[in-house]
Amino acid sequence: MTAIGSSAAKVDRYPNGVGLRMFVAADTAMGANAPTCVINYLDTAGGAGATTTFTSTASATIGNLLNTGAAANKYNPFLPLAAGDTGVSDIVSLVWSGTAHASGTVVIGLCKPLWTIPVPATGIYTKVDFVNALPSMRKIPDGANIQFLMFQTGATTSAGTVWVDFDYGYN
């Protein structure tokens, strides 16, 4: 793995990483086993030695977040940061502890959450107004790659349909 600071890739919008959060997704189908994943990262001051861990998901399919679930040492959807950290400025390493996955590759995602919309159960309609209610009119930087990161609760089902209608104003 090549650290962001050692490659051509740069965290250009948030150079010190304030507010950036991590998640780990399967880039290819993951094999059996559910090892512990240890990620070492640099905090917003560039300090080394910050780590976060989670128990991976055995046989996860492409696109699934490996750090989610209802079991112990799972987090939805973002990995916890070390005490006092407010973001991630660089990823240093990812190490599997214990019996590694039999196969597969992962992506460590760094993202800036703009808002969270709860979907408490399948079939429940949820609407959020970002003009007249809080959080009001979050700034979306030019060139941003807007994506929706969805994780299901125990009260939702994989057969449920999710529709998203996203309107925005440009200044």
Segments the model singles out, each with a brief description of its role:
Residues M1-N171:
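Polar, enzyme-active/binding microenvironments
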